[in-house]
């Protein structure tokens, strides 16, 4: 009788350990999901602020007879423009203008990367299109 009780007790302990590990793994995955989603929403909000800062800076440059977009410069922005944007937004993200409409004087595409998040903005057919991606580094040599 003691042997049977001991076997049943061991099985119950094993089952409890397995269930505990499965529940713990579930909560780890759930925690990481919400952490990544929160970071993505934060990056998206910052990218919307980048868009507003680019528009504001372009209006200011228009008054000076210049353009915020400089295709011959790295990231499509002068160092002064990049510093101004980072000063306005108080962040350390990287902004790269990918397209610009000189007739309407608006930025029609840019990417904003902060941490492991990359936000892509494209203005097409009078609508704003946003993509938020989480970047995973697979190899570092």
Labelled PLM ranges:
Residues 1-9:
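N-terminal Lys/Arg-rich, disordered targeting/topogenic segments
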Residues 130-131:
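N-terminal polybasic/positive-inside topogenic patches
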Residues 16, 57, 62, 73-74:
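Short amphipathic alpha-helical patches
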Residues 46-65:
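N-terminal alpha-helical signal peptides/signal-anchor transmembrane segments
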Residues 9-51:
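Amphipathic alpha-helical segments typified by the pilin-like N-terminal helix
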Residues 64-127, 137-141:
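Extracellular/periplasmic head regions of type IV pilus-like filament subunits
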